[in-house]
């Protein structure tokens, strides 16, 4: 599985998360900056230049503000849920995950 490393040590706002993830997965310029938009493109859409399987590893997360940690947790939960839906509905596992390291 391909790993995409992101350095979160300088992130201060939730927008920093999206400003790092979107170019890393080759999202088009018009891509939305929300969890729903990420789920649509990562699991369902196929519009990004980087296609599954891949893991996004967020490094340097130990000092992230709480609002960013919550957004990442929400993203991880949503990805797992939609992966499960894809398996159940279409018999296909879309291998995309987010890992967080201190």
How would you label these PLM feature ranges?
Residues 41:
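Short acidic/histidine-centered micro-motifs embedded in hydrophobic/aromatic stretches
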Residues 31-35:
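A short, aromatic/hydrophobic, helix- or strand-capping loop or linear motif
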Residues 1-29, 44-102:
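N-terminal intrinsically disordered, low-complexity segments enriched in P/E/S/T
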């Amino acid at each position: 599985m391909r790993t995409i490393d992101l350095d979160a040590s300088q992130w201060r706002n939730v927008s920093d998360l999206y400003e790092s993830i979107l170019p890393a997965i080759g999202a088009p310029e018009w891509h939305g900056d929300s969890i729903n938009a990420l789920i649509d493109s990562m699991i369902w859409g196929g519009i990004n230049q980087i296609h599954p399987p891949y893991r996004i590893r967020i490094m340097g997360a130990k000092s992230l503000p709480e609002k960013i940690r919550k957004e990442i947790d929400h993203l991880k939960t949503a990805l797992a849920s939609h992966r499960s839906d894809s398996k159940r509905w279409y018999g296909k596992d879309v291998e995309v995950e987010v890992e967080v390291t201190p």
